[in-house]
């Protein structure tokens, strides 16, 4: 048995002007890639929506995947009927089987202006039908159940199960960014927020192995695997940082260690960005959350970078960040115990108002170029793909219509 799946794209994609075809093409390719391996076939295509046919047993997995697919506004299982009121009533009657609800509403969207009834007339006729079958009252606001009917040229679609997508732009339409991944709660959320804005994110994790265990590397791998669900193809650079730390510990004032760690991390991330063709860096900083994230310290750290440093969470509080981490599925991994670079030999009383002259004087005593070259040479690069290899080019034979689901 088969089912039909209607996928609607994020509303912002309709506002892209001359670049709109590029954004829509990337969004649709991202949706098709998300559904790879489930036996789906493209039934219909509109500027802002796709209609697929898939096996009934594939629906639960398709639903789970689309809930993580950036660029999707919403999606629904639908029944397709002839563009006829009686056919819609028959489909509604079938959809009502086994359902109970205290209130409902009908929402009609008529793209086919040749259909003899207006959208309000369709809503009234079908609303009276459902009320007669169930006894439930119509409630236009706050209805317990909503049935959406779309009347298209040559067909009508009845949504029987609707779910929200994550929204956002498809990955890669806004360029490439290198994101520093600490293994904590904040940095995976920051990377995700940039993915939602269309950035293709490359992850860089700094680990203290072999000075400490490899636990932080394993956490970074698990987080990268989770984040790959949103981007579908993702690279993770695992950079050994212990040699840099050894030199900083010897030369730097104790209170300045973390500031110097972070400056060297930005330099290494910038070198990776040049290799990757990325135009910006990303961190999970939140202003004032910890000592290293005071305005003075962020200024001192930023001075080491020449690329823009994006901080998507700069105005978020911890509760907001935790809630987002739980929503995107990174929180449980982020709170696992590990030993990360910035906690290694961390000072008991870190500086909160770093003076740039002290930072620069300390760095003048360090073999910066040698340390950067060594860290880059010893790194490991992993690639994650999800849910598999990219799809082939758009299959031929799917019909394309100008007017469709809104």
Curated annotation (Swiss-Prot):
Q: Which residues form the signal peptide?
A: none
- InterPro entries, sorted: Rossmann-like_a/b/a_fold, ThiI_AANH, ThiI_fer, ThiI_N, THUMP_dom, THUMP_ThiI, tRNA_STrfase, tRNA_sulfurtransferase_ThiI
Question: Which keywords are on file for this protein?
Answer: ATP-binding, Cytoplasm, Nucleotide-binding, RNA-binding, Thiamine biosynthesis, Transferase, tRNA-binding
The enzyme's first-digit EC class, named in words, is transferase
Q: What is this protein called?
A: Probable tRNA sulfurtransferase
Species whose genome carries this gene: Thermus thermophilus (strain ATCC 27634 / DSM 579 / HB8)
Q: Where in the cell is it found?
A: Cytoplasm
Instruction: Name its pathway.
Output: Cofactor biosynthesis; thiamine diphosphate biosynthesis
- Which cysteines bridge via disulfide bonds? none
């Amino acid at each position: 048995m088969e089912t039909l799946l209607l996928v609607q794209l994020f509303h912002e994609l309709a506002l892209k002007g001359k670049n709109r075809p590029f954004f829509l093409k990337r969004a649709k390719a991202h949706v098709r890639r998300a559904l790879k391996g489930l036996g789906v076939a493209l039934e219909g295509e509109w500027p802002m929506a796709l209609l697929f046919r898939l096996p009934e047993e594939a629906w639960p997995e398709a639903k789970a995947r689309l809930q993580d697919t950036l660029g999707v506004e919403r999606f629904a299982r639908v029944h397709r009927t002839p563009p006829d009121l009686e056919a819609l009533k028959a489909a509604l009657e079938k959809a009502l089987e086994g359902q109970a609800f205290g209130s409902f509403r009908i929402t009609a969207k008529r793209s086919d202006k040749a259909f003899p009834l207006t959208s309000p007339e369709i809503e009234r006729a079908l609303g009276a039908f459902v009320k007669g079958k169930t006894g439930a009252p119509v409630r236009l606001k706050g209805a317990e159940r909503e049935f959406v009917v779309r009347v298209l040229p040559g067909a009508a679609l009845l949504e029987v199960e609707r779910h929200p997508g994550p929204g956002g732009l498809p990955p890669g339409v806004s360029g490439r960014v290198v994101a520093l991944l600490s293994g904590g709660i904040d940095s995976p959320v920051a990377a995700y927020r940039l993915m939602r804005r269309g950035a293709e994110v490359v992850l860089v994790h700094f680990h203290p192995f072999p000075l400490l265990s490899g636990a932080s590397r394993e956490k970074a791998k698990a987080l990268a695997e989770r984040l790959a669900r949103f981007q579908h193809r993702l690279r993770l650079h695992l950079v050994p940082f212990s040699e840099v730390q050894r030199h900083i510990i010897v030369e730097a004032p104790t209170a300045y260690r973390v500031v110097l760690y972070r400056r060297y991390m930005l330099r290494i991330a910038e070198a990776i960005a040049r290799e990757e063709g990325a135009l910006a860096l990303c961190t999970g900083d939140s202003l004032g959350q910890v000592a290293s994230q005071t305005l003075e310290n962020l200024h001192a750290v930023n001075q080491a970078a020449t690329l823009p440093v994006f901080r998507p969470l700069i105005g978020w509080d911890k509760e907001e960040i935790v809630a987002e981490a739980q929503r995107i599925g990174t929180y449980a991994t982020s709170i696992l115990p590990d030993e990360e670079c910035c906690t290694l030999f961390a000072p008991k009383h870190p500086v909160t108002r770093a003076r740039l002259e002290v930072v620069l004087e300390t760095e003048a005593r360090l073999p910066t170029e040698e340390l950067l070259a060594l860290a880059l040479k010893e790194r490991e690069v992993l690639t994650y793909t999800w849910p598999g290899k990219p799809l082939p080019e758009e299959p031929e034979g799917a019909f394309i219509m100008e007017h469709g689901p809104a």
